[in-house]
Amino acid sequence: DNENGGKVVTHSADLASNEGVDKATAWIIEKLGGADFLVNNAGRSIRRGIESSYDRYHDYERTMQINYFGALRMTMGLLPHMTAKRRGHVINISSIGVLTNAPRFSAYVASKAALDAWTACAASEFADVGIKFTTVNMPLVRTPMIAPTKLYQNVPTLSPEEAGDLIVRAIVYKPVRIATRLGIFGAVLHALAPRIAQIMM
């Protein structure tokens, strides 16, 4: 509880399994009556070149399971309640890598690109029932997920607080997409000069 009357409730869930997602969704519906806002932020990242992944197909399956199917299953479990109330907002945390086609992140970027595409379709389908969808193409954030990659010690990153500010902006203003200047530059460069972009990356 806080001085403004808000109450924070936490609940642990395994979003890497369908059973875990279903249990979490059922808990949200039972305890909270559904959700007005859903932020799909759980995910995993794998940095490995495609040539080094020929015998690691499971990396793609595991990454898709939580980054795409987990978010999709949670969203579809809560959408009926949002539709019944004719209001709701789904914020899907994607990656700057989708805009820049980051090499050696094919499993991760593909999973986030799939979520981006689904979000765009859902936004069109639910536009007339008061449900909004926002994609946040998040840059690198200084979290334990990127710690094993020493290269990122010299790359611009956001603090967790700055990343949180982007999510708050998504909740308040409900844009279709939030992307940083670097992400937008990468997307434009790949669109206008793809060969140059590939060399630069």
Cite the ranges covered by each PLM segment.
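A glycine-rich helix->loop->beta "capping" turn
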Residues: 3-7, 27-40, 46
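The beta1-alpha1 cofactor-binding region of Rossmann-like NAD(H)/NADP(H)-dependent oxidoreductases
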Residues: 12-23, 57
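Conserved mid-core segment of classical short-chain dehydrogenase/reductases
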Residues: 22, 45-61, 104
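Active-site helix of classical SDR
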Residues: 75, 111
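Residue(s) in the substrate-gating loop at a strand-loop-helix junction
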Residues: 95
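Active-site-adjacent segment of SDR/Rossmann-fold oxidoreductases
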Residues: 100, 121-132
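C-terminal helical subdomain
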Residues: 135, 152-187, 191
